Amino acid sequence: MSAPSRAEDAPRIAAIDRAMEQQIEQHEIAGAVTLVATQNSILHLSAVGEADIANHKPMKTDSLFWIASMTKPITATAIMMLEEQGKLSVDDPVSKYIPQLAHLKTQDGVEHVVTLKHLLTHSSGMAEASSAEAHSSKNLEQLIAHYTERPLLFAPGSKWQYCQAGINTLGRVIEIVSGQSYPDFLQQHLFTPLGMKDTTFYPTQEQADRLAVSYKRAGDQLEPAPIAMFGGAPLTSHDRYPAPNGGLFSTAPDYCRFCQMIINEGTLNGHQYLKRETVEKMTSIQSGDLKSGFTPGNGWGLGWCIVREPQGITAMLSPGTHGHGGAYGTQAWIDSKADRIYILMVQRADFPNSDASPTRLAFQQAATH
């Protein structure tokens, strides 16, 4: 990836900066980092607004963000790496690796087989753990134990329903199959070789000092909103499980490296992470005709939302564009047909639908015109 030598020297697209400044003026966000890239270069990288309003801290291009569910495609990538190594198949029943999940039943008492593919496509029917159960779990093994206690919500494969439990279970499968902890596997096989030095479940103090504050609306202003997922624990604390469904922190340039590996069909800077056919499988619709995603016209791949019929918030994207959002408004979308990657980093806790936020719409419209 050809990156600017210094962030402040990065190329900028004025229309994107103006669009984000307008979002700040309308109190939608405090600040934003935006990035537009191709397969091998950055076309735009910019920070506008503030990372911390009270302390007048400007947003910077290396500001750290809780990327929440943008963790999910990374978890899926790790699963596909293990499939390529011959250590698992996405068609395997999850019970092959976690025997406690062997006899899952729907409410009517019928037993069903849940496969890894069901987990990757949010079609497993697995029920969630409670917030209290999640916060009390110190590792993935403890967390997954809670999933065995509940009936399936529907027959696997019959419906799409966004499922944190399924993705978290995949994280535990990664540990069992690889013999490494989930964070160690990601660090060794993705973050270190890709140069994603600021992508972590457990920020250092230096990284935490760069974290953009999360905000929610209070009338026509913004007020701080702590990250609920972590239950008030210090972000630097290791006393929590590394959440495969949404525990990562990252920066726009870091996440771009991951996206460039995907848009380059599994290879970046001469290092092959995945085979081309594996990336094609991940980023093509695997959910059939099931109504999928949080905005109209989408399907689901293996860990990725896929734009089936561009419309509304996706109208400016090509069919087949794939990406994922995060709970606090972060977004990353890969339009392979146009050779474009679009990354938006913001921290807004109360967007009614972060995938359909006015900030995402403004960014994508400015970035594609």
Identify what each model region corresponds to.
Residues 8-65, 103-104, 141, 145, ...:
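Short, conserved catalytic-motif segment at the N-terminal edge
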Residues 13, 17, 21, 33, ...:
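Extracytoplasmic/secreted envelope proteins and their assembly/folding machinery
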Residues 328-341:
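Short, surface-exposed beta-strand/loop micro-motifs that present aromatic residues
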